[in-house]
């Protein structure tokens, strides 16, 4: 997910997306442990998405990037 797409989401949608991404990461790690994961690169991509979402949530908490 692109940063611009994430910024366009509402706070509630961000929380939902964060939970979905965490769930997806859990499933990917489980697949990796059982040897069923075909593309290990997906783990890194999902982790980066989670980091982007958390960054945007924190920016909104601190009101960074908001034009007054």
Curated annotation (Swiss-Prot):
Short name of any one Pfam family annotated for the protein: Ribosomal_L29
Keyword tRNA-binding: no
Keyword annotations of the record: Ribonucleoprotein, Ribosomal protein
Domain of life: Bacteria
Any one of the GO CC terms: cytosolic large ribosomal subunit
Record keyword Transcription regulation present: no
Biological process annotations from GO: translation
An example Gene Ontology molecular-function term: structural constituent of ribosome
SUPFAM superfamilies in the record: Ribosomal protein L29 (L29p) (SSF46561)
Protein name, as recorded: Large ribosomal subunit protein uL29
Record-stated family: Belongs to the universal ribosomal protein uL29 family.
Gene of this entry: rpmC
